[in-house]
């Protein structure tokens, strides 16, 4: 996931596309523009941590990725959490599954969402974000701006 965040920060589309199972380049320009625009507000990412659980089949996993967004002009990092499903590629690397989510996978993520560890991680991330925004008005304003 560090490679993912670095590719986003650098607008490195070659690396970014290779991180996904589809390797689809049709939206490459759209993502490049989005990442360039984000660079105005986001200076980077830090403290990337992956919490994984086995997937539905061998060579697959679900991951909850904790990371902190570094907004430009804001001192306090913004705690964040994202969920992904990854599949091991033929070369042994992991790729983010960007295909249409099957009913089976949807059900699997629903089951994971009630797992005590997943619920705790989500709660801790939300609480950390709330505390960070309470402590830093600039962060609160930036987060609200980015939601628009």
Language model: regions and residue ranges:
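Short, charged/polar low-complexity linear motifs in solvent-exposed/disordered segments
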Residues: 33-35, 80-82, 112-116
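Low-complexity, intrinsically disordered terminal/linker segments enriched in charged
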Residues: 96-148
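A short, surface-exposed beta-strand/turn
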Residues: 79-96
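Sec-exported extracytoplasmic/periplasmic mature domains
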Residues: 5-9, 21-25, 71, 91
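Intrinsically disordered, low-complexity acidic/polar segments
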Residues: 72-76, 95, 105
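Short, aromatic-enriched amphipathic alpha-helices that serve as compact interaction elements
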Residues: 1-15, 135, 142
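Short solvent-exposed beta->alpha transition segments
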Residues: 14-67, 73-78
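Generic alpha-helical secondary structure signal
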Residues: 8-9, 35, 45, 49, ...
């Amino acid at each position: 996931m560090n490679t993912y965040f670095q590719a986003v920060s650098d607008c490195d589309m070659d690396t970014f596309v290779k991180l996904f199972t589809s390797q689809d380049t049709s939206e490459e320009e759209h993502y490049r523009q989005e990442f360039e625009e984000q660079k105005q507000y986001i200076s980077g990412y830090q403290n990337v941590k992956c919490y994984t659980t086995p997937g539905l089949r061998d060579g697959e996993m679900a991951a909850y990725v904790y990371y902190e967004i570094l907004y430009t002009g804001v001192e306090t990092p913004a705690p964040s959490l994202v969920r992904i499903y990854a599949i091991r590629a033929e070369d042994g690397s992991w790729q983010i599954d960007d295909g249409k989510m099957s009913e089976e996978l949807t059900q699997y993520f629903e089951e994971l969402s009630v797992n005590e560890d997943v619920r705790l991680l989500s709660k801790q991330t939300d609480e950390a974000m709330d505390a960070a925004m309470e402590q830093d008005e600039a962060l609160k304003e930036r987060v609200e701006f980015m939601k628009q």
